[in-house]
């Protein structure tokens, strides 16, 4: 039987301040409101407090304290998700990973990178591309979403057609468990047959099994050239038949997207109106 969660009190606030400093503990109305929503439509749950640790040690101490006091913790990143995964439905603590935002190491020899979960997807992609390396997962919010959130949701984008999604590029994770224990889930190798596959268990778990504090990503060589084609079809059926024909011909496009005439007309109209004003 699940015990009733405890409310955050003054003693709890003082304890959090002692762990991470008063500048990283927030309980003002404006901050609580900002962290009560993500991009999920018409959902809002207010936390009782927002805390912003900077490393796994601080997170471990916070989790141990909350575990002892039965205070719920909801980890969050950039809050760009559409499934409500970062919403504190039980109140309690919202733990933001935004200060864990370092690209720790780029291992060009082994095509790997070690990063913290608060790094923005596009910032990471641009960083590795300067070294002729490629991190393919490209969710629609890549300009603002955090890599930690991508892991929590197993995010992907149009390029998943050829390259796969987030889970296909994760080698190893540092995770703080609900007990406060800090573990690594795997090894920095492509083939690892030792024990349970804890790395993939954590990917897509939406913060319910632990808080990810470091990630080792696999990278691939940057494609030398990209070509974009726009092909009109007289019907949706013909477009779908073309997709099947492309794959049967042995071609593997990076992405394929379908646009209806109404959508194209709307974009054209908006572009025209922008020039008129």
Q: What is the meaning of each model-derived region?
A:
Residues 55, 235-238, 277:
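Alpha-helix N-cap recognition
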Residues 270-277:
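Conserved small/polar residues in nucleotide/adenosyl-binding loops
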Residues 259-261:
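Active-site beta-loop-alpha junctions enriched in small/polar residues
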Residues 11-20, 61, 65-69, 127, ...:
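Generic non-transmembrane alpha-helical segments
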Residues 1-39, 68-71:
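N-terminal accessory segments
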Residues 263-265, 273:
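Acidic, glycine-rich loop-and-beta core segments that form the ion-binding/anion-interacting portion
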Residues 102-106, 111-257:
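FAD-binding subdomain of flavoenzyme oxidoreductases
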Residues 30-100, 115-117, 136:
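Glycine-rich N-terminal segment of FAD-binding domains in flavoprotein oxidoreductases
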């Amino acid at each position: 039987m699940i015990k009733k969660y405890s409310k955050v009190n003054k003693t709890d606030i003082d304890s959090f301040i002692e762990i991470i400093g008063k500048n990283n503990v927030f309980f003002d109305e404006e901050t609580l409101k900002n962290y009560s929503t993500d991009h999920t439509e018409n959902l809002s749950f207010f936390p009782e407090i927002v805390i912003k640790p900077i490393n796994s040690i601080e997170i471990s101490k916070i989790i141990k304290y909350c575990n002892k006091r039965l205070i719920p913790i909801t980890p969050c990143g950039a809050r760009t998700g559409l499934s409500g995964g970062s919403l504190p439905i039980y109140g309690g603590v919202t733990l933001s990973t935004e200060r864990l935002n370092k690209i720790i190491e780029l291992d060009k020899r082994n095509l790997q990178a070690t990063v913290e979960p608060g790094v923005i997807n596009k910032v990471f992609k641009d960083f590795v591309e300067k070294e002729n390396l490629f991190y393919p997962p490209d969710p629609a919010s890549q300009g603002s979403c955090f890599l930690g959130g991508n892991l929590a949701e197993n995010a992907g984008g149009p390029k998943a057609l050829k390259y796969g999604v987030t889970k296909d590029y994760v080698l190893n994770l540092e995770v703080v468990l609900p007990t406060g224990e800090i573990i690594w889930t795997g090894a920095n190798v492509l083939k690892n047959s030792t024990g349970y596959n804890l790395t993939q268990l954590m990917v897509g778990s939406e913060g319910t099994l632990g808080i990810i504090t470091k990630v080792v990503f696999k990278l691939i060589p940057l494609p030398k050239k990209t070509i974009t084609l726009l092909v009109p079809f007289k019907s949706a059926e013909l477009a779908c038949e073309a997709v099947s024909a492309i794959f049967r011909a042995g071609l593997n496009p990076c992405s394929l997207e379908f646009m209806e005439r109404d959508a194209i007309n709307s974009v054209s109209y908006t572009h025209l109106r922008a020039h008129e004003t």
